[in-house]
Amino acid sequence: MAEGTAQDAFLRIEGVSKSFGSFQAVRDVSLTVGKGEIFSLLGGSGCGKTTLLRMLAGFEEPSAGSIFLDGRDMAGVPPWERPVHMMFQSYAIFPHMTVEENVGYGLKHEKGLSKADRANRVAEMLDLVQLTPFAKRKSHQISGGQRQRVALARALARQPKLLLLDEPLAALDKKLREHTQFELMSIQARTGVTFIVVTHDQEEAMTLSDRIAVMDKGEVRQVGSPTEVYEFPNSRFVAGFIGSINTFEATVIARESPHLCLSVPALGTEVLARDVAVVAVGQAVTLAIRPEKLRISRERPEGANALAGTVRDLAYFGKDSLYRIDLAGGGMVQAHAVNARRGDEGARVADWDDTVFVGFDPASALVLVA
């Protein structure tokens, strides 16, 4: 999908802040979102993501800054006059109505829409979310995933330019949530409506989004594609919030292009990492390595970045295992390994109390300065 720029963005958020008394919920946020993009606001509880969503919907007015939607300044525009629909976490499906009545509820008072046109729009939405066979059923006669699709169809029926989704999949179990993520992506692609998704679930944001804004304490810490925020986080906070990561205090002791040589006291040795132009020799940094980037072996691997250690704990997840390894230098790392072989202990690369080596490619090591 198209990425918004300051000049052509479908949605522009410029220096927006929101205070409730002395508490500042959103701090000087500026974002651009392109037309037809799925854009996620990702963060923990209290980070300001829902407050920002409510300002987009018109339920809250910014204390400072401006919001432009499709070139129009939204200042003073009430919710019912905005080309925006909001889908809440609870779905708010009316239990006394059928599926088709729920979907068509918002169309009853739409000007210029005849009864026949309304029926056609409802039929079109039911077909879009694959609920035509369930049109006459009440909400208690369909599943949680189907209720979620009813809420989505109702939100899209009024043909909004922007759809705001507040934790849309939080009420679903894991398997249904994973399945529904792909349904949402398919429906969005067919309608072309711009989606803004609020979520605390990193996997959900990574799966759904064209781009993600990671928020903390009312501020946007990083904006980028799922690959960018995962593989190239710009701070220790983002690196730790998106997935699991091992972090160590380090010092740059040499630049050996294309690598940096780092002294890492917790590892008891020097290691090589990908060069980062913004750091200087002698600078204190953070070395960060994702668990899946580490390789566990019984024999010492060739090359740099080979660390000896002992397996102190492991968790078996079926397709892979997570190992906690105490290193000879005094530190500890977590490492993921795929269980490629079939069997009991034979499926794992190591067991409790085994002496192992942990290695990693210098290109897989992140050097963070914030």
What do these predicted ranges mean?
Residues I245, R255-A370:
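Non-catalytic connector elements of ABC transporters
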Residues A57:
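Helix-to-loop junction immediately C-terminal to a conserved catalytic motif
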Residues L42-G44:
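The feature captures the beta-strand-to-loop junction immediately N-terminal to the Walker
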Residues T50-L53, V150:
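ABC ATPase nucleotide-binding domain helices that frame the ATP-binding cleft
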